Amino acid sequence: MIRPKVLFLCSGNSCRTQMAEAFLRDMGGDRFEPLSAGAEAAEMLDPDAVAAMLEVGLDISGQQPKRIDPFMRERVSYLVTLCEREIERTCPIFPGAFWRLKWPIENPATANDRDEHRALVRRARDEIREHVIRFVQEHS
């Protein structure tokens, strides 16, 4: 059975798309092939994203930020952007997708201080989890 590829894209691939990839891997089982990338790959995962995912029982510490470039020639069934395009000018455009979905999740990097950043990461995590739940229900 060929699993549909689901590519999650954002600006840096350090937080939101990493969480989405992990949630789909967990909730979708072997029904999907989750991937994630960013216009620019961050140097490392956002430590607050790693901590927030551990709070819900998922360990993303072994995942690495990836640039979109290696995926540009791939065909994917679903492209999911997690950017607020109006704000994030670096949100990538991807030509090889059959279906395109937009989940406008606020970028925690816009936080003014560490406490606000942690709160935004948790809110993003919870919003992404709800989106993934609906995605799995609608596309399984």
Residue map of PLM features:
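Short polar/charged helix/loop
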Residues: M1-S140
